[in-house]
């Protein structure tokens, strides 16, 4: 009996020894990351207005930047807001796919496109904020990828709004013009953002912002027009459609987010106080995420409840619209790649 007890105690001792090794194993698996640095310690390309600390050191290993997902720095919230939102979109995608045949139902393809587009822009944005600090070329590469995601989401939203949310009166006015114009403006947004970022050393900060904001604003005005017309028509008729409320809120959330994207508040009022939490761009991320999730819920409901209406209205439009989506995505990706090559050549010349 005593021997058995001693064996059990010995096993407990060995287990205790193994438990003591866990912190060492974790430390070897997740090494201590270099501390963040001040704005004066990083090249100008990484600097953000009114953000004075929390920058990650450039020229580290890729592993370091992936591990900074779990480090406190001035991009942490920007990464996690869109990363978690991308996961939520995947969950919604799986949930919807249990009742919707995306492959065989052509009228479900625009819903598939907007879900794919939302996941794409959220994922690309998270990658840009996580990995862009490695080098100047990485900075441009990942933000150009982010802009491709923005273009894809713009067209995906335009298609879904046009297909599911539009009223017959507005459809009559924009039929045949809406989707090609939406595709062009989505590409123009990608080009404007990429060129503005590429030319930013020679442009004032405001001009760089204009290259991003003006094409995006034009695209949004067109893309959201079916929704705005529907909200207005509902208000005029005094209807009580709950889906219209969802559409109204996702417009409001987007406009609030756009304000924080354009205006560096509150960090401009409290320089250095919002370096880790409270930046305008973080607030922009939060509102855009809420906007996207509200939009998806509204379109999902429209897909179910308005099917007889949009089947008669659009006929076999879905296949052509999907082809235009692929074309827009390819053009945007090629544009981003071309501007990246220009950046690479410019950095090579500067290095010489």
UniProtKB/Swiss-Prot annotation:
Pfam families: HlyIII (PF03006). Keywords: Cell membrane, Developmental protein, Differentiation, Lipid-binding, Membrane, Oogenesis, Receptor, Steroid-binding, Transmembrane, Transmembrane helix. InterPro entries: AdipoR/HlyIII-related (IPR004254). The chain crosses the membrane at residues 76-96, 111-131, 140-160, 176-196, 243-263, 276-296, 317-337. Residues 1-75, 132-139, 197-242, 297-316 are cytoplasmic. It is found in: Cell membrane. GO terms for cellular component: plasma membrane. GO terms for molecular function: nuclear steroid receptor activity; steroid binding. GO terms for biological process: oogenesis. Residues 97-110, 161-175, 264-275, 338-352 are extracellular. It is a multi-pass membrane protein. Induction: By progestin in ovarian tissues and human chorionic gonadotropin (hCG) in oocytes undergoing meiotic maturation. Strongly expressed in ovary and brain; lower expression in testis and pituitary. Not detected in heart, kidney, spleen, intestine, gill and muscle. Belongs to the ADIPOR family. Steroid membrane receptor. Binds progesterone, progestin and 17-hydroxyprogesterone in vitro. Capable of mediating progestin-induced oocyte maturation. May activate a pertussis toxin-sensitive inhibitory G protein that inhibits adenylate cyclase activity; it may therefore be a G-protein coupled receptor. This is Membrane progestin receptor alpha. The gene is mpra.
């Amino acid at each position: 009996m005593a021997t058995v007890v001693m064996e059990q105690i010995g096993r407990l001792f060995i287990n205790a020894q193994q438990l003591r090794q866990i912190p060492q194993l974790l430390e070897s698996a997740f090494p201590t990351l270099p501390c963040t640095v001040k704005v004066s310690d990083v090249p100008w390309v990484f600097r953000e207005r009114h953000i004075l600390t929390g920058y990650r050191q450039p020229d580290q290993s890729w592993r370091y930047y992936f591990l900074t997902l779990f480090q406190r720095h001035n991009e942490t919230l920007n990464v996690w807001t869109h990363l978690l939102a991308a996961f939520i979109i995947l969950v919604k995608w799986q949930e919807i796919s249990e009742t919707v045949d995306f492959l065989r139902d052509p009228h479900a393809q625009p819903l598939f496109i907007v879900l794919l587009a939302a996941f794409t822009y959220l994922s690309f944005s998270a990658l840009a904020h996580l990995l862009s600090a490695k080098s100047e070329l990485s900075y441009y590469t990942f933000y150009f990828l982010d802009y491709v995601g923005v273009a894809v989401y713009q067209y995906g939203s335009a298609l879904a709004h046009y297909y599911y949310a539009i009223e017959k009166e507005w459809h009559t006015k924009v039929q045949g013009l809406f989707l090609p114009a939406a595709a062009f403006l989505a590409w123009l947004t990608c080009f404007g953002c990429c060129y503005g970022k590429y030319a930013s050393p020679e442009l004032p900060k405001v001009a760089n912002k204009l290259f991003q904001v003006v094409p995006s604003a034009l695209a949004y005005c067109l893309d959201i027009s079916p929704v705005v017309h529907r909200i207005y028509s509902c208000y005029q008729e005094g209807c009580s459609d709950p889906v219209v409320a969802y559409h109204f809120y996702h417009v409001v959330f987007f406009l609030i987010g756009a304000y924080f994207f354009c205006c560096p508040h509150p960090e401009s009022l409290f320089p250095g106080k919002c370096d880790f939490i409270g930046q305008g761009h973080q607030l922009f991320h939060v509102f855009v995420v809420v906007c996207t999730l509200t939009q998806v819920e509204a379109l999902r409901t429209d897909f179910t409840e308005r099917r007889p209406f949009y089947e008669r209205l659009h006929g076999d439009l879905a296949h052509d619209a999907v082809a235009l989506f692929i074309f827009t995505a390819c053009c945007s990706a090629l544009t981003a790649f071309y501007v990246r090559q220009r950046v690479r050549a410019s950095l090579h010349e500067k290095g010489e």
